[in-house]
Amino acid sequence: TIAEYMLPALLGDFGARYPEVTIHLRVSNSEGIVSMVENNTIDLGVVEAPVGNKNLVVEMCREDHLVAIVPPNHDLANLETLEIKKLLEYPFICREEGSGTREVINEYLENNSCDTAMDISMELGSPEAVKGAVEAGMGVSVVSRATIQKELKLDTLRAINLMPKLERPFSFVHQKQKFRLRAMEELLDFARGYCEDHAEEQL
């Protein structure tokens, strides 16, 4: 989610300011990103789920707002707010195990006394696949509002706010020791400033 919807703008601005720095971007789910940071495969990760490894440094960037999505012709399409129990009466399309979105939704279900063993009709590996399946009428889902701006404008999906609301932090994660390259310190400092400057934007 993050790599597709937040990082391009951040890295574009960074590249314009530091044209001599080459950045190699890898996309994975939160579990995969944490593993790559642990193994020093990457220097800096951005994740959307809690990080259990206490040996890593985790810094929150900003809050992300998650919403229920349904196709425009769905029974729930005209609602403004919705309790998660009502949404779970319909076939549910979710991300794969290890995804930050899946982990956050499971935690939300537990906190709201819902069974995490819901009626899952599909497990898919990307936000685009989830959106496509919901658009095709194969079920309902919960996604980051940041991922559906185009679909909302085209009216191929409807977003419904969950009650209570569902938010999660986007966080940077890295090793405690200093970065091997000075450019990584500059990137992290730039990213911190970018998050502060864009904190009020709708995600």
Residue ranges and their predicted role:
Residues 2, 6, 158-201:
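A late-sequence structural motif
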Residues 53-93, 97, 182:
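Flexible hinge/capping segments at coil-to-helix
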Residues 37, 68-69, 172:
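Intrinsically disordered, acidic Ser/Thr/Pro-rich N-terminal transactivation domains
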Residues 6, 10, 22, 36, ...:
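Conserved functional loop/turn residues at catalytic and ligand-binding sites
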Residues 31-34, 42, 49-55, 103, ...:
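A ligand-binding cleft/hinge motif common to bilobed small-molecule-binding domains
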Residues 1-54, 115, 124:
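Central regulatory/effector-binding core of bacterial HTH transcription factors
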